[in-house]
Regions:
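Rossmann-like adenosine-cofactor binding region
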Residues: 1-60, 180-186
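Adenosine-phosphate binding glycine-rich loop
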Residues: 40-101, 241
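NTP-dependent small-molecule kinase module
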Residues: 87-99, 119, 123, 169, ...
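Hydrophobic anchor at the beta1->P-loop junction of P-loop NTPases
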Residues: 105
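P-loop (Walker A) phosphate-binding loop of NTP-binding proteins
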Residues: 108
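Conserved lysine of the Walker
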Residues: 113
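ATP-dependent small-molecule kinase phosphotransfer cores
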Residues: 133-191, 230
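A glycine- and Lys/Arg-enriched "phosphate-lid" helix/loop adjacent to the NTP-binding pocket
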Residues: 192-230
Length: 262
């Protein structure tokens, strides 16, 4: 399909809605004049259709605020009260999105993802999920053993499968492994329900002991050079983790609360 006459797309089907996330009926690239996409699906926040629209630099909006508006207008109807809908709907939508949003943390091995993530989850009253620990729990093997016995490709398959399930959830801080961004499917899974926070830390300050792909020295510099463009492409916000844990968490909270995408 190639339709140069279409400027706006509105999806009113349940395609892409939880639990069947990732489904999409059309490709925005087939519509060269496209200016905006509205998907009335509200879970996840960003369906595959919206993610594809964003990839095309097209204005995209989901159905979450519409869901809130429906509740507000229903309240008016059944109670007979007149509400300040222009103020209430966006305010309630933003508050609920902050409550439900995931914060996914990416970055180089040893940059502090798990440490910052656990503390951030406590501050935001969200569940903390360490993706590597969850992979170990589900496979029954620790990650160095998976790399040694099955290879990196097998580990990456486990990683993608586990993340696909976890990322469907809400109200989580997800600390990911350093190489999670190597798969576009992983990046899309992380983006569907909240911001992706890239934790950056000086190379010499990285804690790399016991990590399969982090040997230090020249190898670590090469790994950073390879992955930095992927972190840049996957992230929506950047946290410079150059100081104390408290400072990093304070800044992460500020970035989350100020995120205009929520």
């Amino acid at each position: 399909m190639h339709r140069p006459d279409v400027q706006i797309i509105v999806n009113t089907t349940p395609c892409g809605m939880f639990p069947n996330v990732g489904q999409c009926l059309i490709d925005p690239k087939a519509f060269p004049a496209l200016e905006a996409v509205l998907d009335v699906v509200y879970n996840p926040f960003r369906t595959e259709l919206l993610l594809r629209a964003e990839d095309c630099d097209v204005t995209a909006a989901g159905g979450f605020e519409m869901l809130v508006a429906q509740a507000v207008f229903a309240t008016e109807h059944f109670t007979g009260r007149q509400l300040d809908t222009a103020a209430i709907i966006p305010a309630v939508s933003r508050e609920l999105r902050h409550q439900l949003a995931n914060v996914s943390i990416i970055g180089m091995p040893g940059c502090g993802k798990s440490t910052v993530g656990a503390a951030l989850a406590k501050r935001l009253d969200k569940k903390f999920v360490d993706l590597d620990a969850e992979i170990e729990r589900r496979t029954g093997h620790n990650i160095p053993d998976i790399f040694a016995q099955e290879g990196e490709a097998a580990f990456r398959r486990y990683e993608t499968d586990v993340l696909a399930e976890i990322a469907k959830g809400n109200s989580q801080v997800i600390a990911c492994g350093g190489g999670v961004i190597k798969s576009p499917a992983n990046t899309r899974a992380l983006r569907q329900n909240g911001p992706v926070l890239w934790v950056r830390r000086p190379l010499e300050a990285l804690a790399t002991g016991g990590r399969p792909l982090s040997k230090g020295g020249a190898a670590l510099k090469q790994l950073e050079a390879e992955r930095t463009p992927l972190y840049e492409a996957a992230s929506t916000v950047v946290l410079e983790n150059y100081g104390t844990l408290t400072a990093a968490v304070d800044k992460a909270v500020q970035l989350f609360e100020a995120d205009e995408r929520l």
